[in-house]
Amino acid sequence: MFQDNPLLAQLKQQLHSQTPRAEGVVKATEKGFGFLEVDAQKSYFIPPPQMKKVMHGDRIIAVIHSEKERESAEPEELVEPFLTRFVGKVQGKNDRLAIVPDHPLLKDAIPCRAARGLNHEFKEGDWAVAEMRCHPLKGDRSFYAELTQYITFGDDHFVPWWVTLARHNLEKEAPDGVATEMLDEGLVREDLTALDFVTIDSASTEDMDDALFAKALPDDKLQLIVAIADPTAWIAEGSKLDKAAKIRAFTNYLPGFNIPMLPRELSDDLCSLRANEVRPVLACRMTLSADGTIEDNIEFFAATIESKAKLVYDQVSDWLENTGDWQPESEAIAEQVRLLAQICQRRGEWRHNHALVFKDRPDYRFILGEKGEVLDIVAEPRRIANRIVEEAMIAANICAARILRDKLGFGIYNVHMGFDPANADALAALLKTHGLHVDAEEVLTLDGFCKLRRELDAQPTGFLDSRIRRFQSFAEISTEPGPHFGLGLEAYATWTSPIRKYGDMINHRLLKAVIKGETATRPQDEITVQMAERRRLNRMAERDVGDWLYARFLKDKAGTDTRFAAEIVDISRGGMRVRLVDNGAIAFIPAPFLHAVRDELVCSQENGTVQIKGETVYKVTDVIDVTIAEVRMETRSIIARPVA
């Protein structure tokens, strides 16, 4: 009799609409219960039985129950699952399989089966890619996943690389394809094969994409020709190779090996500016005045060159610093190195006075054995030879940015707008508390930003600099010319790495159109979206492989008294993140390791400080001594402890 009763339906509807609900993200804990985090201030308790319906990271709508002053959440509807496609380790045998996601907060095995057509007999310990198929909040009985790809077996030494690439859905090898002959682009190539061009790279580099030639001019001026490898002489726009490069967007540099954007035959041979081999190039000729200013007679042209020497960073630096036993092979090469060092000096001073110069951070290099084991991690400081190449490339990119802006009005530009305008007042207020007075309007201009950066660089420590970093906007890739506040430049467009960056290949094609006096089509904005996304994924992959290798490298130091100098990079409620100075590893120091009495300890992310009994004991950028307390291989995390 109550079956289709409209009153009853109305009552149900009323009850439903009156029941309080909240949308938020599920946060799991080690203890079985969880929380529904609605925002930074508000969260609701989720009891263990209800946690079985959800997974850490799920965005859900939950019914809020109140009993005896205590509120709890009952998951009701799935808004967005945390897991869709993921990597994990297989448990069990072929008839009954489960997969444990490779994620620090997901410990439960999810029942699964292999997808149809996947011809691999899965066994315990295998790594696989899986996709979620069932979720309790979608009306399914339980969680269920389907294995869609076999990655590798559990004991494979190269697990860090294969699992990371699969996780981010990135290619594992070089693209297929060959380029048999150069295209007829209708370009006249200047013959510069007689000039003493040199390349300066790491000893192991095969994909040399830049060669340099310098010449002294009257009136204390210097001429610099930057010659860049010319892959677009082989790869036609819209061709199969071009499309593959467009998807990859960059060469992916991981510790130990790289996955090139172009086939190796092109990147490491046909396009690579090898010593004593004639190669086509796109070149830029510029004149530098005595104070390092780039004069207006910038010239882009196509050419052929023959590099006369493959020089190595450390050897060149040693020679310029009068150490080591390496000597340039001829006086002509020695003269090139001397002139290039002079150009570097002038350009460095010009940028210091008129733009911005980054503080030098060492690069960390993993030295790996045959089986992927980490033999050592070495800090490679940026020396004079690195700076020679860097200054030449920055100068060449400034030239390209100007030419593309003035002749076409578009290109692939690296744009960085400095501070987010919404943060300007908060930034000025923060700086004021530290005795620096800035105008909130002025700091949003390029000049105002540069002025502030120079003041910050003159501070005795980097503490204040670290505090304001959160107010900065991110660098972007844009087809529209715009300033790059981080470099202190009005415009910046890279074209000096076309073997490893697709955006540089696009700029090559645009520069060639300018050289030929032709009209060019503006690049589509979606290509900048693809490039930004690939850059993000490649960086995450590099970080993930690095974390794995750091954990392997430091595992035997856990629980020992070995001391490491460590810079504090971040402070949060739970403790401090530090970077080990000698090798670049990131470690976490939990708050209880800082002080035993929790009530006397204040870890403030906002202030970047740790206070004990009201006294500031640690702050971001401090360098302290730590020991390694524990290395958790399953989460690749390193736990450190300050040396008392």
Curated annotation (Swiss-Prot):
The keyword Nuclease applies. One of its GO terms (molecular function) is exoribonuclease II activity. It catalyses: Exonucleolytic cleavage in the 3'- to 5'-direction to yield nucleoside 5'-phosphates. Involved in mRNA degradation. Hydrolyzes single-stranded polyribonucleotides processively in the 3' to 5' direction. This is Exoribonuclease 2. Belongs to the RNR ribonuclease family. RNase II subfamily. Pfam families: OB_RNB, RNB, S1. Residues 189-516 form the RNB domain. Gene3D superfamilies: 2.40.50.640, Nucleic acid-binding proteins. It comes from Shigella dysenteriae serotype 1 (strain Sd197).
